[in-house]
A protein has these predicted regions:
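Contiguous beta-sheet cores, especially beta-hairpins with glycine/small-residue-rich turns
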Residues: 234-236, 320-471
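Structured extracytoplasmic
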Residues: 43-220, 229-234, 240-254, 259-324, ...
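Active-site and channel-lining beta-strand-loop segments
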Residues: 221-228, 359-360
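Sec-dependent N-terminal signal peptides
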Residues: 12-31
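Extended non-catalytic domains of envelope/secretory-pathway proteins
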Residues: 224-226, 238, 368
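N-terminal secretory signal peptides that target proteins for export/translocation
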Residues: 1-15
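Signal peptide processing junction and immediate N-terminal pro/mature segment
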Residues: 29-46
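Hydrophobic beta-strand positions
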Residues: 185, 225-226, 398-399
Length: 471
């Protein structure tokens, strides 16, 4: 039998952007075998006398199923969609005069218990996710290969969570330090479930909180439900202990509702929906709803590819398109397809057609022919509720012309205004506006801002003017 090696499971990482710190739940697959969590007698002791079921045996069956499916996640990749909501107190949370606690203190702060909240911002992300070795790896949904960077570098703002795909489960079910107690049984819509509570103390936890200079271990606790008939995990709920002040938040809590998804010829235990909430000392809260779709299984011929392996450009010998366009060229781009703020997400692919040929300065040489296609992705899809605006940040990074793909670095043309939008449904209010990119996009890219109405969208054919810059 292969020797079991227990690996660190989770990380919660600090990165101050937007309204709250970034969260990372980085998990490992853990050992190939299972160790006892609690003894059978300890679990049975919690069951009422006279019952015919065995909570310990059911738990053992469930653990084996969980371990099998988490290891098999190495063969799968899915699209992960994250919808994040940011809330702030409707009224200012003042310091406690009696205790002299500062307004950003975590003392007495509870989820939903600090007065009415106001929805400030919503955004949406779409990522590719798979498991490599003992961790989850990610890419933007539009990417042709996985990114060699961490998810915290890919998504530079807001709360982002690693582990929702399932790699965090070994830290609960394969951790010898986890204390599990049978809590009873109940009837759910899908049948009878057994409920257990668990606690992972800090001394046994692999859940760490990252600050700018160090990592801090935190304990956590929660409960889970197992279907009595099938020994399948139905739901898991957890909450961290109070986090250290340098974490930038007080606590996080998570809820995972599970189902088995048919991927290829096999079934895999994947969350139907996950919800991860954060609470800050200022009583701000965030809620992230995570779902998985378009899952597929790698075949024997498949292999993972990373961005670092991709050449910077695929330029054919003798091509008339230069390998790198000089700075200062003006391009008018027309969107190839519409972008609907109700469904679009950061990570989605976008493309636009070059409307007019671009010539070399002081020359008739055509550097970019009309009809060439600029490819890129959405970097931010945000709904700002106070201003009632949609903000859609886009960056184009490659240009395809005559079968040749070259790198492309663009920013808004600062001197020329965008041309009037071509639209079948007019944009309401102030219409479509254009601005420089947000800080996390760097110097390239731009932001479309439009009134947040039901009919609002960026239509196919929408033209905007850009200028080439040095990468």
């Amino acid at each position: 039998m292969e020797q079991a090696v227990y690996r660190p499971a989770r990380k919660l990482c600090l990165a101050k952007h937007l309204m709250l710190a970034t969260i990372g739940l980085a998990s490992a697959l853990g050992p190939a075998g299972f160790g006892m969590i609690v003894t059978a007698s300890e679990v049975r002791a919690q069951a009422p006398l006279g019952t015919s079921y065995d909570p310990s045996a059911l738990l053992d069956r469930a653990r084996k199923k969980i371990g099998s499916t988490t290891r098999r996640l190495l063969k799968c990749t899915c699209l992960e969609t994250i919808e994040r909501s940011y809330y702030a107190p409707s009224e200012k949370v003042n310091a406690n005069v009696m205790t002299e606690n500062p307004t950003n203190s975590c003392d007495a702060k509870e989820f939903g218990g600090n007065g009415p909240l106001s929805l400030e911002v919503k955004d949406r992300l779409r990522l590719g996710v798979t498991v490599l070795g003992d961790k989850e790896i990610y890419s933007w949904a539009a990417a042709s290969r996985f990114d060699s960077r961490s998810v915290f570098q890919i998504v530079s703002s807001g709360p982002i969570h690693m582990g929702s795909f399932g790699t965090y489960l070994p830290d609960i079910f394969e951790n010898p330090g986890t204390r599990i107690t049978f809590a009873g049984k109940k009837n759910e819509g899908s049948g009878e479930v057994f409920e257990y509570t668990f606690e992972v103390p800090a001394k046994a936890s692999h859940y760490s909180v990252g600050t700018e200079n160090a990592w801090r271990i935190t304990g956590y606790h929660g409960s889970f439900q197992i279907y009595a008939a099938t020994a399948e995990l139905a739901r898991l709920v957890e909450e961290t202990e109070q986090l250290p002040p340098e974490a930038g938040m007080c606590r996080t809590r998570s809820r995972f509702d599970y189902h088995y998804m048919l991927i290829g010829d096999d079934e895999f235990l994947i969350p139907r929906e996950s919800r991860v909430d954060t609470l800050s000392g200022t009583a701000n809260e965030t809620s992230s709803i995570i779902t998985f779709s378009d899952c597929r299984e790698y075949t024997a011929e498949s292999s993972l590819r990373f961005e670092a392996e991709e050449p910077a450009a695929t330029v054919k010998p003798g091509s008339q398109v230069p390998a790198l366009l000089p700075a200062g060229l003006s391009l008018t781009l027309a969107l190839s397809g519409s972008i609907d703020p109700a469904t679009a997400a950061a990570g989605d692919a976008v493309s636009a057609k070059v409307s007019t040929a671009v010539r070399a300065p002081h020359s008739n040489q055509i550097l970019v022919p009309a009809g060439a296609i600029a490819h890129g992705r959405i970097l931010q899809m945000q709904h700002q509720y106070r201003s009632n605006r949609f903000l859609i940040s886009i960056r184009f990074d490659t240009l395809e012309a005559n079968g040749v793909v070259t790198p492309l670095s663009l920013q808004w043309d600062r001197e020329l205004k965008a041309e009037k939008a071509i639209t079948q449904v007019p944009l309401r209010s102030r219409g479509t506006e254009f601005s420089l990119p947000p800080p996390q996009t760097g110097e390239t890219g731009g932001v479309f801002s439009l009134s947040a109405t039901k009919a609002a969208y960026l239509p196919a054919g929408l033209k905007s003017k850009w200028i080439t810059v040095n990468p």
